[in-house]
Amino acid sequence: MSSEREERTFRSSPVQQDDVRENISNENQEHPSPNPPSYASSMAESQTLLPKRPIIGGQTAKLQNKNRTSVHVAFADLPRDLPEIPDGISDRRRVHKEQQHLGLDTTPPVPPRPLSRLRDVNSHDKLPSIRSPRNLNYQPSVRSSRSGSIFDDAPSMAPPGGSYVSYGMHDDGSPQRPWTPSSRVSGFTRSDLSRPPPSDGMYEPSDLNGSPRPGTPSSRYGGSPRRPLPPAPLFSNSRQPVPPIADDATISIPLHDTYDDDVFAPESDLSDARPHPVDRSSYMSSESQDTLNEGDMEDYDKVEHYGPAPTGAQERRGVRAPQMSRKEVQLINGELVLECKIPTILYSFLPRRGEVEFTHMRYTAVTCDPDDFVERGYTLRQTFGKTVRETELFICVTMYNEDEIGFTRTMHAVMKNISHFCSRSRSRTWGETGWQKIVVCIVSDGREKIHPRTLDALAAMGVYQHGIAKNFVNNRAVQAHVYEYTTQVSLDSDLKFKGAEKGIVPCQMIFCLKEKNQRKLNSHRWFFNAFGKALNPNVCILLDVGTRPSGTSLYHLWKAFDTDSNVAGACGEIKAMKGRLGANLLNPLVASQNFEYKMSNILDKPLESVFGYITVLPGALSAYRYHALQNDETGHGPLSQYFKGETLHGQHADVFTANMYLAEDRILCWELVAKRGERWVLKYVKGCTGETDVPDTVPEFISQRRRWLNGAFFAAVYSLVHFKQIWFTDHTLARKILLHMEFLYQFIQLMFTFFSLANFYLTFYFVAGGLTDPKVDPFGHNIATVIFHILRYACVLLISTQFILSLGNRPQGSKKLYLISMIIYSIIMVYTTFATFYIIIHQLTSKDDKIEMGDNVFTNMIVSILSTIGMYFIMSILYLDPWHMITSSAQYFILLPSYICTLQVYAFCNTHDVTWGTKGDNVMKTDLGGAVGKGETVELEMPSEQLDIDSGYDEALRNLRDRLEVPESPPSESQLQEDYYKSVRTYLVLTWMIGNGILGMAVSEIYSARGIGDNYYLRFLLWSVAALAVFRAIGSTTFAVLNVINMIVEGRVRLSLKAPRWMGGLKERVNDKMSSVSSNLRS
């Protein structure tokens, strides 16, 4: 019976009989091990359940065919320090049998686990293990922490080495993966092999595309298709948590101290990590000694695992991109035009829903130049269907990369102005439906430059929708994306919705998103030549994003054109945005600009309006009569000259013209007034005001003034050179005389601007040098002389430094240097102002010198101060706006040297730079996809597919294989242009610098610093300043008087004057005379 039992044992064992029979028989003779009767049958059953297929791979121990005798056994080299097997039955087994006999065995059975396999690189050093099928009744080992195993009654074999990687024991709560090697075992259909019920924890679904999660927004929109969601944790439902591991390698430590009498006692691992699975059939196969590691790896690759951790920013869970689909669309006149429904949420609270303009947003992909917009058959909603309307007022809002705060500030103010138009119920032009005569056009310069939040604001108003724009239509590049919608809601600067309950009326909006960044001049060409030509409006208003017009400003601008048919352009008052309670005025830079803007609107603009020619209508808030802008039959006119600067290239471009177009708002002014055969005039409207942001940092301030100063200088030169064009206009003789007086005034101003640097130095030299006289020295001990020489040398060095900085450094890269220079200039100005007032006070209190009005220092100083500061106060009070004199005048006078030196030096040294600080975008983008089709039908494709990426890669490989030579490109037009402008810049800077240097050195050598009374040049300088100030005041006063007369004539101020009866018809004759005088002044 013993031999038969051994025969059955060897027949069932996975080890080769010929190789191990002798070792096992010897061990059984010394220490016989009791075998349970069911052992052989259990092993036979396990062999029938496992498939027997060969797998090729690396070397390890396997079952061999019985007829093969000379085969190397992998576990022959066992460790030499194995524990010795004791004689007889062990104490542990004896105690275990006694507990079984008495029924005291309380060891809980462990549920069966799925079949697995062990994986180890050094498999030839390990003893092959055997795992029995599930749910078989085995006798458990003594005091074992796990259920009974087949090893409890296995033949006596040596334990594995210390490098053996044990199988991590898991609870039955571990979910079964969708595919594992154990699933290949046929015949297992028991419930213990099925996946356990889901746990209570919430985690991402295991579906690749991300199925919805309960209780999250993704249950409505679905998961994100861009990122595969990880499956549920492997041991989410296990009863015992698995501790984290630091390494995949595990170390097996035999517990000899506790189970020194049991060779097959359980081993403890330092790590509970689950090792890599190994195919169990490799141990049960009897065909080859070689296992197939490659096949094992193929099986392992099919096992689902977590994968690497995602890198970079991840999308918010529950939100995904809109699903795109392909649709066939019918072209309209060969062009792509789409009518898109507005969002449901926006539609839900609209008060008006009866027309398509309220329920659908219209998208047009424009593939032509703006000059060909109408000729190519493009239309706007106001030109066809039920929405055919006459456009009275066309408003243009240009923007580049401004944020949503600046955009909503401007747009909400515009919509409140439209509400004011509709509130004028007694007007013959406006009224309740007045909004139908107003169209607002927003032109954005560059699709990739626009601020994303600004697009969000437009989308909230219903004007813009993401995902419908295309880069090309039938292989024609799209130049601009045009969105049309009549919105009924507005967003204020606090990003709060305002609707009909706040008085907001519908607003017809056109949003033109240019594909490329081509500067502001091109944006105006889209407005005037494309949309203006299609709508043919009466008045066009230009606004910049960030400017906030007051509630009635646009009405006052339009009214100026309605009351005077000779007005071709008008502008309002630009105010600096002072912030809440004037907090921005704490910044000296903002305060100085506030003073400058105020005095320009009090002195300069009214004077120029009296003459009829305003040198600059600010683009931030101005208006033009569209009919006056049109070209004549030969194509020459204001618009042709205005857009001439957009096509200047290379050395053929005129540097004066290029710089003049930096201040493009000055060009239309001259072209309108000097238009042949017309009598157009420009007007300043005092009732129109608009607030705008001003630069609050030094680099931004210098860059802005560089454009303004160069544009103003070259535009003034252009108008003075071409002043003869006025002779060919239809202006009256009186108007032509007034215009020539203005040209003379501009010429004098231009000369003072050109020599302002030398005049500043000479003023400082003579005034501050006047304190060096020991009789006048306020400090004594020649301290004033030391201070004067220090400041004099500092001024000369500072001016020289300004040239070096301006020629080689950008303001953004030299913030501290420019700031330090402005601080030193302020110190020089403060000392010069102190010297001026001290000299005047010394003359008043001196006993030796008599106070006389005449040719002396006292008279010259008093006249100069009263003509500047005094005149500023008087005119500000006359216009009932004196507060800037209190809050901002000191900051302006302190920073005045910086205006003269820093700004003008930088401007003249950068006349070669004719850009706005941005470069044109000439690269064709294809990120939006295109509309491709045949005939009148196109198919809208999704963005780039994998096939497109592969084709581009293949083309690159073919170019490398064929070694295609890249031709050398000639010098670019931009490089030629830059070289030419730099040469002109050098000549201009040299001329300007030498001229100012000669004047300063000559006058300083002729007149000493102490002889102020005999200084004729200083006398001329002071009296010239006074004369110019008085001239400006006269013009401003004339404007105010004419306004009063105009109010009287129009009946807004009624005078009830009763004449005596004996005077007869004198009253009627006086009224007729006043009417005739008013009509002559208007002409």
UniProtKB/Swiss-Prot annotation:
Residues 1-10, 18-30, 78-100, 117-128 have a biased composition (Basic and acidic residues). GO terms for molecular function: chitin synthase activity. Glycans are attached at N23, N67, N417. It catalyses: [(1->4)-N-acetyl-beta-D-glucosaminyl](n) + UDP-N-acetyl-alpha-D-glucosamine = [(1->4)-N-acetyl-beta-D-glucosaminyl](n+1) + UDP + H(+). Keywords: Cell membrane, Glycoprotein, Glycosyltransferase, Membrane, Transferase, Transmembrane, Transmembrane helix. It is a multi-pass membrane protein. It is an enzyme of class 2 (transferase). GO terms for biological process: chitin biosynthetic process. The chain crosses the membrane at residues 708-728, 747-767, 785-805, 820-840, 860-880, 889-909, 987-1007, 1020-1040. One of its GO terms (cellular component) is cell septum. Residues 1-248, 260-294 are annotated as: Disordered. It comes from the Eukaryota. Residues 38-49, 61-70, 132-148, 177-191, 282-292 have a biased composition (Polar residues). Its EC number is 2.4.1.16. The keyword Transmembrane applies. It is found in: Cell membrane. Disruption phenotype: Reduces the chitin content by about 10%. Does not affect conidiation nor nuclear distribution, but leads to increased hyphal hydrophobicity and to reduced virulence on tomato plants. Strongly increases sentivity to the detergent SDS. Pfam families: Chitin_synth_1, Chitin_synth_1N. Its main location: membrane. PANTHER family: CHITIN SYNTHASE, CHITIN SYNTHASE 2. Belongs to the chitin synthase family. Class II subfamily. Polymerizes chitin, a structural polymer of the cell wall and septum, by transferring the sugar moiety of UDP-GlcNAc to the non-reducing end of the growing chitin polymer. Plays a critical role in cell wall integrity and virulence. This is Chitin synthase 2.
